């Protein structure tokens, strides 16, 4: 088997996400939270494994020659599927047993007759790379936002567009997005990814309170808090996006707001479409030359 640290970066990323999943699911089961475990597994399989890893690696799977790159892709996918079968066995016992036996009997990699006889997976800390996970999440978020804007304007992905602008909140975010800019360009079919200082003023942020989260948390103080949120400056909005929380003073009390407590959007610029999610804003140039 090819060592994980000798496989391509995208293989190392999905293995890192897999081991993060193992830790989370183990904790959910220990807390008697099977619903949270199921959601975590579902998100991993749909968003990370299927929509991202398998799709980006499809040319590696299709290769005619059985070289190391193709072997690494198959070994990585196999590890993910067998591990998912083991993680899901307590909540989907029959299907996961079938999946496990189909995978292991064909390869002879494990001697257990059933997934329910196999050991529950253990997280390997050396395989977890949080910086790589964060970097790839930026690529996923930007790509998802741009593709949603294309869909909104009914501009097909095969139609190249000139550029996408992304305001960055700090040097770390700039470095992470720069590292995956080629991947973003290939995914959304744009020629340029332009990173802006978030304080440049090109994009004007708007903010409004999220009453669904504020109401249960703050009750009668919600009115004062929502009024304060609506008066936030651009600097306060940027700090909230950068730090994922912001402390404000309401009637002599310190209140900590999170990104879940607000809805942040950006004003559209003529000839551009703007969207944001997870603290990332994109502006897509929709001019077709």
Task: Annotate each language-model stretch with its function.
Residues 1-289:
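Feature 926 captures the class I aminoacyl-tRNA synthetase adenylation module centered on the KMSKS loop
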């Amino acid at each position: 088997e090819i060592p994980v640290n000798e496989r391509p970066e995208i293989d190392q990323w999905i293995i890192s996400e897999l081991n993060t999943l193992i830790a989370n699911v183990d904790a959910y089961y220990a807390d008697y939270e099977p619903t949270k475990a199921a959601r975590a597994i579902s998100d991993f399989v749909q968003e990370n494994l299927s929509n991202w890893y398998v799709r980006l690696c499809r040319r590696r799977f299709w290769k005619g020659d059985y070289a190391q790159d193709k072997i690494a892709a198959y070994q990585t996918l196999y590890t993910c599927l067998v591990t998912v079968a083991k993680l899901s066995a307590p909540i989907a016992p029959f299907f996961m047993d079938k999946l496990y036996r189909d995978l292991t009997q064909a390869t002879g990699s494990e001697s257990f007759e059933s997934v329910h006889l196999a050991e529950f997976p253990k997280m390997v800390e050396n395989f977890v790379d949080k910086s790589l996970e964060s970097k790839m999440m930026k690529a996923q978020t930007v790509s998802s936002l741009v593709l949603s804007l294309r869909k909104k304007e009914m501009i097909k992905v095969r139609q190249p567009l000139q550029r996408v602008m992304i305001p960055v909140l700090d040097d770390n975010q700039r470095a992470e997005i720069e590292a995956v800019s080629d991947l973003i360009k290939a995914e959304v079919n744009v020629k340029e990814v332009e990173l802006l200082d978030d304080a440049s003023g090109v994009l004007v942020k708007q903010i409004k309170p999220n009453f669904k989260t504020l109401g249960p948390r703050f009750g009668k103080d919600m009115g004062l808090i929502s009024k304060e949120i609506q008066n936030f400056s651009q600097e306060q909005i940027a700090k909230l996006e950068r730090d994922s929380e912001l402390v404000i003073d309401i009637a002599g009390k310190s209140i900590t707001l999170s990104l879940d407590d607000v809805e942040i959007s950006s004003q559209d610029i003529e000839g551009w479409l703007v969207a944001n999610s997870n603290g990332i804003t994109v502006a897509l140039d929709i001019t077709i030359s």
